[in-house]
Amino acid sequence: MIPRYSRPEMSAVWTEENKFGAYLKVEIEAAAAWSQLGVIPAEDVEKLRTKATFDVQRIYEIEKETRHDIVAFTRAVSESLGDEKKWVHYGLTSTDVVDTANGYLIKQANNILRKDLQRFIEILKKRAYEFKDTPCIGRTHGVHADITALGLKWALWFEEMRRNIERFEMAAADVESGKISGAVGNFATTPPFVQD
């Protein structure tokens, strides 16, 4: 993100470090689901949780050779592991990791926006009460009309924003998700339980 157009908190969501961290979270949680199915030993999942690391520059070095971002990522992570590295990316395809991680990153960004929207709507509500008895000129067709209350204008903005937040939450529910369904997306090698 361009720093002058973003706050540090939001910029931090979209760093390469956080992106690859989200990839790793997806990889580990998928392995944990496989473990619940009895495929991956629980102790190997614990090793993935405690030992798996990556270095962004190392990922880029490997990507120069592989010309594939996820292959580079999984190899870089595997370098930090022992025998348990065989479970990295088990039953997954690249889009399983990328799409699910992107949903997670969007959720992080939306959580920042949620706080801002809540703070904003509280200000609108406060102003509506503060100015409930303050007269102002009403308008119709862009010209002066009858007297109205400035607080009413704030209340209308509040109500409009409340509806906007409802729409935001509906959209967020759609994008704060992912999918883990295997190589061609048909669950042929990866059961739906791993996704759920």
Where are these regions (language model features)?
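A helix-coil-helix interface module used to build multimeric assemblies
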Residues: M1-D196
